[in-house]
């Protein structure tokens, strides 16, 4: 256990181990992806996609390994019963830090299918990682503002098309579609700017989850409502690497999949409103849970 080392040295060791793990697994991932690209047939995809997922799971296991070696973490995880790697899941979570991604991958690795995150388009240019996300078919979203779309109406619907295309692929092999419904990491400044009605959360957005339900609603076996809390305060990624995070709380709530009406009388706006109301209730429950965590921490 290296957690007793000085923070700068610990951060250097953790960063190095993380980078070595990336440099080992990503080239393997890309090599297999190129084969799939050169042989774009369904039966090839049905063989290669599970192989890509096994490679990604091994990569995540490597991350869990260096985390165990360098971090003295107390994991308080609840609600993991009855999960299956052979089921399709829609996963939603609050978003506080880049550390959330490592936490989610560590907790769910090989317990459910690989988490597929919806990413900002700009992230495809991140060295090495952008290629890895592309190889794993994470959808890249433009996330244009409403003001921009009013000026460029020809771009309206591009994210919807990207989501539908991704979900069509995910329907072939068990997948966990992951969505941070707030769309960005929580900060006090964003919370104030939004005038969020929640104490610990930003306002959730239902657009992406509505599209996923439209495309794959019949495939999803359950919704996993995940709440992450850091009793020591929201950490930066560097603070995590340097060992400043001592405890992580993760609560998983398994919920039935909401069934949106698909009759012709329901407009897209009406369907999105129904989903938004459902999401708002999720967020109200999540905010109450985070408040109870905060009370325990102060106590």
Language model: regions and residue ranges:
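Accessory terminal regions of nucleic-acid processing enzymes
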Residues: 19, 262-299
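Membrane-anchoring hydrophobic helices of lipid-metabolizing enzymes
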Residues: 1-89, 95, 103
């Amino acid at each position: 256990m290296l957690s007793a080392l000085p923070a700068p040295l610990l951060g250097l060791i953790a960063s190095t181990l993380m980078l070595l793990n990336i440099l080992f697994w990503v080239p393997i991932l890309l090599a297999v992806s190129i084969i799939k690209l050169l042989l774009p047939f369904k039966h090839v995809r049905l063989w290669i996609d599970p192989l890509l997922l096994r490679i990604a799971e091994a990569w995540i296991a490597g991350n869990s390994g260096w985390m165990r070696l360098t971090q003295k973490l107390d994991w308080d995880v609840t609600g993991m019963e009855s999960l299956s790697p052979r089921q399709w899941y829609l996963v939603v979570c609050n978003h506080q830090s880049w550390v959330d991604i490592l936490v989610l991958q560590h907790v769910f690795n090989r317990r459910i299918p690989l988490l597929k995150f919806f990413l900002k388009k700009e992230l495809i240019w991140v060295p090495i990682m952008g290629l890895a996300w592309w190889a794993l078919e994470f959808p890249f979203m433009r996330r244009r503002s409403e003001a921009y779309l009013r000026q460029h109406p020809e771009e309206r619907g591009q994210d919807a098309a990207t989501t539908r295309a991704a979900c069509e692929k995910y329907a072939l092999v068990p997948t966990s579609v992951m969505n941070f419904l707030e769309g960005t990491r929580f900060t006090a400044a964003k919370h104030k700017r939004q005038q969020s009605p929640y104490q610990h959360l930003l306002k959730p957005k239902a657009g992406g989850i509505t599209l996923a339900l439209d495309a794959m609603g019949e495939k999803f076996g359950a919704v996993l409502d995940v709440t992450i809390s850091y009793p020591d305060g929201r950490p930066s990624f560097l603070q995590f690497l340097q060992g400043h995070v001592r405890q992580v709380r993760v609560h998983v709530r398994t919920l039935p999949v909401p069934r949106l009406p698909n009759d012709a009388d329901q407009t897209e706006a009406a369907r999105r409103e129904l989903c938004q109301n459902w999401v708002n209730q999720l967020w109200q429950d999540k905010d109450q849970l985070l408040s109870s965590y905060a009370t325990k921490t102060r106590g």
